[in-house]
From Swiss-Prot:
Listed GO biological process terms: arginyl-tRNA aminoacylation
Enzyme Commission code: 6.1.1.19
Identification of the protein by name: Arginine--tRNA ligase
Pfam families the UniProt entry points to: Arg_tRNA_synt_N, DALR_1, tRNA-synt_1d
This protein's encoding gene: argS
Organism: Xanthomonas oryzae pv. oryzae (strain MAFF 311018)
Gene Ontology CC: cytoplasm
Motif ('HIGH' region): 129-139
Length: 562
């Protein structure tokens, strides 16, 4: 619909150039066509006249009137009016929305998919949990947001690579190995000899028992076997990391989350990428030595203070491998790099960008982009869920999926802005009622499937071509409300991709489901008149298609029965 109006406005601008209202060399401005906040102001509005007023040396409202007069006639536009300082509002005819139903039917699964990315490359990194324990609900929110964001970007024409970064070279891994070793030697977290910074969750005992039993773990095709020797710390380290990575992969698979690339922090050291990044920074002239340490002049690039890169003992601070890792993303050809992180990591944003800018390699400012999510509180029976002992103080993603469903967990972890704190209500997520948004949306899809089955049981032969030809019959308030929502879907997908906010898809699906349920309750679908029945079934099938398309972007199933 926007394309139709942009074409009409473009023709109007050409007419104003032809009659001298606009100078002949006036270029069409980058005007917007958008939906007003309220329907009283029409279906769409444009600011074209306000942008052209200076070139025409005219009052914006006066130019808006001239542009309005110059617009060609269209059967899809019933009224055009001027509002405010020079906006032009368009009211569309039912035929415009009825035609959109035909577009949904014709394009099917591709309806709503766009070409904004034009095949350009984008790397989306998310979850990136340390392989030191089970995935908790915070990791789950990262997984849901990151995976849905990757799906939305793919729907917008980007060549998306999904990436998981394993921090397998830090002090946490050493603490993990020492904790498993202590368990293997018969100690408990309350024992006097327990490691000072050891992990206390019951899962550590599971790892130790598997190691002592000589179990073999498949870590993405590499088999790692426990040697049963509690004194072999290096063997314990390898086995524990493999065991917990395997556990995390199991949970992510159950959550319908997968990755194209698993990148190990340890490979940065093994392949010399950390040293390469350090040498590039030294060569750039943005480093200095002080107190036996190597510093980055990160204040030259927006940081609040300079940062130590290499400590006096020769070891690197944690942000250096982060810079090296993101340098590899640039070297791998990502035009965009997007990292989804917990909000507690916000301090690393500026220093990583500063390190990349200091290399003077032409990396754009603001690269990489970040999406930060806030914490999740889990509630049951109106009370906060006690932290799980097995995970050592966290509610695990696995527990949530088992108590509710992958669909419910994904929906609720996506459905609010990432930067807002989220309360996950287990009782609501399990409820089969209209108060549960994922149930409400999925039921709309299942309801269409049910109507189609009923039509078949009654012996009605649904003729979709006939239904498309008879859509003009559906000009009542509730039918048009559904059509309007269907027409919004491509815009919502595009905006969600631009803003990196997949929650907008969830909000939209609730609104579409509401319009559909309202229409269904106010309009008998399986009527005797074949023309009217086919038209209504066609509208229902179009709704079913858009619901399925949107749910797929969220990684939520579209059930046929409920």
């Amino acid at each position: 619909m926007k394309a139709l109006l942009r074409a009409l406005i473009g023709q109007g601008i050409e007419a104003l150039r032809a009659n001298g209202t606009l100078p002949g060399d006036t270029l069409p401005p980058d005007f917007v066509v958008e939906r007003p906040k309220t329907r009283e102001h029409g279906d769409f509005a444009t600011n074209a006249a306000m942008l052209l007023a200076k070139a025409a040396r005219s009052n914006p409202r006066a130019l808006a009137q001239a542009l309005l007069t110059a617009l060609p006639d269209s059967n899809d536009v019933t009224k055009v009016e001027i509002a405010g300082p020079g906006f032009i509002n368009f009211h569309l005819a039912p035929t415009a929305y009825q035609r959109e139903v035909a577009h949904v039917i014709k394009q099917g699964h591709d309806y709503g998919r766009g070409l904004a990315g034009n095949g350009r490359s984008v790397g989306v990194e998310y979850v990136s949990a340390n392989p030191t324990g089970p995935l908790h609900v915070g990791h789950g929110r990262a997984a849901a947001i990151g995976d849905s964001l990757a799906r939305v970007l793919d729907a917008n024409g980007w060549n998306v690579k999904r990436e998981f970064y394993y921090n397998d070279a830090g002090v946490q891994i050493e603490n993990l190995a020492l904790s498993v070793q202590a368990r293997a030697q018969g100690l408990t977290p309350d024992s006097a000899g327990w490691p000072e910074n050891g992990y206390r969750g019951d899962y550590i005992a599971d790892v130790a028992n598997a190691y002592l039993a000589g179990d073999t773990v498949d870590m993405e095709g590499h088999l790692v076997t426990g040697t049963k020797d509690p004194a072999d710390l290096e063997s314990i380290r390898r086995f524990a990391v493999a065991y917990l990575r395997n556990e995390q992969n199991h949970d992510l698979a159950a959550f319908r989350v997968d990755f194209d690339i698993y990148f190990l922090e340890s490979s940065l050291y093994k392949d010399g990428k950390v040293e390469e990044a350090v040498q590039k920074l030294i060569a750039s002239g943005h480093t200095y030595e002080e107190g036996g340490a190597l510093w980055l002049k990160s204040t030259d690039f927006g940081d609040d203070k300079d940062r130590v890169m290499r400590k006096s003992d020769g070891t690197y601070t944690y942000f250096v491998p982060d810079v090296a890792y993101h340098l590899t993303k640039w070297q791998r050809g990502y035009e965009r790099a997007i990292t989804e992180l917990g909000a507690d990591h916000h301090g690393s944003l500026t220093r990583v960008r500063a390190g990349l800018q200091a290399m003077e390699l032409g990396i754009p400012q603001g690269w990489p982009e970040y999406v930060l999510h806030q914490m999740v509180t889990v509630m049951r029976d109106g009370e906060e869920v006690k932290l799980g002992k097995r995970a050592g103080g966290y509610v695990t993603l696995r527990d949530l999926i088992e108590e509710t469903s992958a669909d419910a967990v994904r929906w609720f972890l996506i459905a609010r802005k990432p930067d807002s704190q989220l309360t996950f209500d287990i009782d609501l997520a399990r409820a089969q009622s209209n108060d549960n948004p994922v149930f409400y949306v999925q039921y709309a899809h299942a309801r269409v499937c049910s109507v189609l089955r009923q039509a078949q049981e009654k012996g009605y032969k649904y003729d979709q071509v006939h239904g498309l030809a008879e859509l003009a019959r559906l000009d009542d308030e509730h039918s048009l409300a559904v059509m309007l929502e269907l027409s919004r879907y491509p815009e919502v997908v595009e905006i969600a991709g631009q803003t990196l906010e997949p929650y907008q898809i969830a909000q939209y699906l609730r609104e579409l489901a509401h319009a559909f349920h309202t229409w269904y309750h106010n309009s008998k679908v399986l009527v005797d008149d074949a023309a009217e029945r086919d038209a209504k079934l066609t509208l229902a099938v179009a709704t079913q298609q858009v619901l399925a398309n949107g749910l797929e972007l969220l990684g939520v199933s579209a059930p046929e029965k409920m």
